[in-house]
Every structure is written in C-alpha cells, then in structure tokens.
C-alpha cells in the first residue's frame, strides 16, 4: 500500500492585521459573534487564526459585551 501524503495545514492569517484594523469594539456584536461558539464560549486562537494581541482584544471586547448584555454568557446545555 502506498503511504498517505501528510500535508501541513494552511496557516490562518489574522483578520485584523490583514485589514489594518485599529481595534475591536465591544459594541460590534456582528463581528464578535464570529469569535464565539454556538454555546457562547470564546474560540481559541488556533481556531480563529488571530494573532496574540488581537485575540486578547477580542476576548476583552467579548467580556465587555457580555457585561452590557449584548452577548450571552456560556450556556451549559443541561
């Protein structure tokens, strides 16, 4: 049998660095919903492809949006 070819996964590029965005606004819920799961959890960097600084900014913005009740807190599904 031939050996399966192992391909490296394509590196994701930070969406904010690519667009030269100045920052992440907690009031922009449409943008922030891309970075939370259907359960309301913040997605990891390796999933979203964000750089370190922008992932921190997204996490802070999501937490602020939750405080103001623009985004839901995590649900357990019980």
From Swiss-Prot:
RNA-binding in keyword set: yes
GO biological process, one term: translation
NCBIfam families: S18
Name by which UniProt lists this protein: Small ribosomal subunit protein bS18
InterPro entries, A to Z: Ribosomal_bS18, Ribosomal_bS18_CS, Ribosomal_bS18_sf
Keyword match rRNA-binding: yes
GO molecular function: small ribosomal subunit rRNA binding; structural constituent of ribosome
Gene Ontology CC: one annotated term: cytosolic small ribosomal subunit
Gene giving rise to this polypeptide: rpsR
PANTHER family registered for this protein in UniProt: 30S RIBOSOMAL PROTEIN S18, SMALL RIBOSOMAL SUBUNIT PROTEIN BS18A
Record keywords: Ribonucleoprotein, Ribosomal protein, RNA-binding, rRNA-binding
Chain ranges passing through the membrane: none
Taxon lineage: Bacteria, Bacillati, Actinomycetota, Actinomycetes, Propionibacteriales
Organism: Nocardioides sp. (strain ATCC BAA-499 / JS614)
Family statement: Belongs to the bacterial ribosomal protein bS18 family.
Function: Binds as a heterodimer with protein bS6 to the central domain of the 16S rRNA, where it helps stabilize the platform of the 30S subunit.
Subunit details: Part of the 30S ribosomal subunit. Forms a tight heterodimer with protein bS6.
Name of one Pfam family that matches: Ribosomal_S18
């Amino acid at each position: 049998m031939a050996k399966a070819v192992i391909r490296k996964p394509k590196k994701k590029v930070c969406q904010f660095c690519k667009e030269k965005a100045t920052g992440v606004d907690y009031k922009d819920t449409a943008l922030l919903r891309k970075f939370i799961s259907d359960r309301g959890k913040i997605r990891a960097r390796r999933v979203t492809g964000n750089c370190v600084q922008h992932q921190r900014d997204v996490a802070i913005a999501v937490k602020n949006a939750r405080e103001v009740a623009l985004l839901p807190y995590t649900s357990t599904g019980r």
